[in-house]
């Protein structure tokens, strides 16, 4: 059925305006982004098919240009638009952290770190450098490694923290295996970094491990 023949209250845009964005399904949200369908499929049918083909919205969003454009009705222009939306979302989360106390918005912190690290194929060690009010000064990937390990050098972390004049750090890294449970090696390097940074009066506030659909906090476990 053409989407124009659907009841007005069931159309994605109208439904969003009347009930809010959280009332929409993944396919309905994607339909608003896509705007039009293809020959033989209205935009909702196309959205539903894309999500099923990729397995989830997340896998659709992390698809390469070639993978995305291989689907009927999807071209370079739509791929560019999607990447722009994702980048704006990431910047919004980063700005939210930089304007306030990172520790008063743990859900934003986890969401931001997950968006940065979750889909990486190799392990990456990421640091949020904070001022004395726990606001983000700078965030960056410090180390990248193989598919299952990243070498972390405490001396380099200390140098970078001093360069940014940081008062505290939040650490994060991903597990490409998808299993977020911290390893003994994760706990050891956290202790080494804590000890090294303490020599220059810089604290580690938390260490997050990002897996597939889960982010584990050392602080919440009482390990920091």
Curated annotation (Swiss-Prot):
SUPFAM superfamilies: JAB1/MPN domain, RuvA domain 2-like. A motif (JAMM motif) lies at residues 173-186. Residues 102-224 form the MPN domain. GO terms for biological process: proteolysis. Gene3D superfamilies: Cytidine Deaminase, domain 2. The keyword Cell inner membrane does not apply. Residues 1-21 are annotated as: Disordered. Keywords: Hydrolase, Metal-binding, Metalloprotease, Protease, Zinc. GO terms for molecular function: metal ion binding; metallopeptidase activity. Belongs to the UPF0758 family. This is UPF0758 protein VS_0182.
């Amino acid at each position: 059925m053409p989407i124009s023949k659907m009841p007005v209250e069931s159309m994605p845009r109208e439904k969003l305006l009347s009930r809010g964005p959280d009332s929409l399904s993944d396919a309905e949200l994607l339909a608003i982004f896509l705007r039009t369908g293809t020959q033989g499929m209205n935009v909702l049918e196309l959205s539903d098919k894309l999500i099923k083909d990729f397995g989830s919205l997340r896998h659709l969003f992390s698809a390469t240009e070639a993978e995305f454009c291989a689907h009927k009705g999807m071209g370079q222009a739509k791929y560019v638009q999607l990447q722009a939306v994702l980048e704006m979302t990431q910047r919004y989360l980063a700005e939210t952290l930089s304007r306030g106390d990172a520790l008063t918005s743990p859900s934003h912190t986890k969401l931001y770190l997950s968006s940065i690290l979750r889909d990486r194929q190799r392990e990456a060690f990421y640091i949020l450098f904070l001022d004395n009010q726990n606001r983000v000064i700078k965030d960056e990937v410090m180390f990248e490694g193989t598919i299952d390990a990243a070498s972390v050098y405490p001396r380099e972390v200390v140098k970078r923290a001093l360069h940014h004049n940081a008062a505290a750090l939040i650490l994060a890294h991903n597990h490409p295996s998808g299993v977020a449970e911290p390893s003994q090696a994760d706990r050891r390097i956290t202790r080494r970094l804590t000890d090294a940074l303490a020599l220059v009066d810089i604290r580690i506030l938390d260490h997050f491990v990002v897996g597939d659909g889960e982010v584990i906090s050392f602080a919440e476990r009482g390990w920091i």
